[in-house]
């Protein structure tokens, strides 16, 4: 149980949308080295353009809902934005497997988790999640038009 209510006046700093939202999400990826995080490079730190571009995705740092993402990136795509390389990342492509049975074709799933880490506590606490189903090349509304059994919701979990 938290020591405060959301409606109480408290001394906190909120992470605001959009700039801090974008900075915290994609901006941190090149700094995280883990088998659970796809390899990610700031474009302006790229030593050479990879030969296997079919395994990479080009993403603008400050975009939302997949806008500006080049899923099938080409050398000209990279060369075009290279002058603005400080606001782009190149990320290893993640292949989502269609494992959720639906009435027509299996869907891919993504589960995003949000944790809060209360000061003085040893671990963060899971507070909410976002579950999304997709049948498109990417997860998001623009990539799932005219598809059924796709979209987002909150998932229930045991405490």
Name what the model sees in each region.
Residues 1-159:
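Domain-scale recognition of functional cores that engage charged ligands
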